[in-house]
Amino acid sequence: MIIGLGSDLIDIRRVEKSIERFGERFTHRCFTDIERAKSDGRKNRAASYAKRFAAKEACSKALGTGLANGVFWKDMGVVNLPGGKPTMILTNGAGARLAAMLPAGHRANIHLTITDDFPYAQAFVIIEALPVNG
């Protein structure tokens, strides 16, 4: 069953300006080590960061909190499964909120899609509760 849904659309130029103005202060505040390594190695660095930023916004909406109530930027991280499909890992406040949303006997499956078409980056997050024995 779907227990959370969120989406976000961001202007890549906004993220690019934040990177130019604040540099590592911005990237270290908002992104995990894995996200920074992935984005810093990309030709379109700002677009890569913007997609991950949008994913975090979408995820916070799917959690029903936004970036409040103990949910912080680095509590949500975009990672890729072995086949390359993106998903999210939630820790700390975001992980606690996710656990509180799950019905007894269920585990979370987070679906994520991210895309960009300059000047925009977009993300959709669906949080699904799946039976542990099913």
From Swiss-Prot:
Its cofactor is Mg(2+). One of its GO terms (cellular component) is cytoplasm. It comes from the Bacteria. One of its GO terms (biological process) is fatty acid biosynthetic process. The keyword Metal-binding applies. It is found in: Cytoplasm. Mg(2+) binds at residues 8, 57. InterPro entries: 4-PPantetheinyl_Trfase_dom, 4-PPantetheinyl_Trfase_dom_sf, ACPS, Ppantetheine-prot_Trfase_dom. Its EC number is 2.7.8.7. It catalyses: apo-[ACP] + CoA = holo-[ACP] + adenosine 3',5'-bisphosphate + H(+). Keywords: Cytoplasm, Fatty acid biosynthesis, Fatty acid metabolism, Lipid biosynthesis, Lipid metabolism, Magnesium, Metal-binding, Transferase. GO terms for molecular function: holo-[acyl-carrier-protein] synthase activity; magnesium ion binding. The keyword Transferase applies. It holds the Pfam family ACPS. Belongs to the P-Pant transferase superfamily. AcpS family. Transfers the 4'-phosphopantetheine moiety from coenzyme A to a Ser of acyl-carrier-protein. This is Holo-[acyl-carrier-protein] synthase. The lineage of its organism: Bacteria, Pseudomonadati, Pseudomonadota, Alphaproteobacteria, Hyphomicrobiales. The gene is acpS.
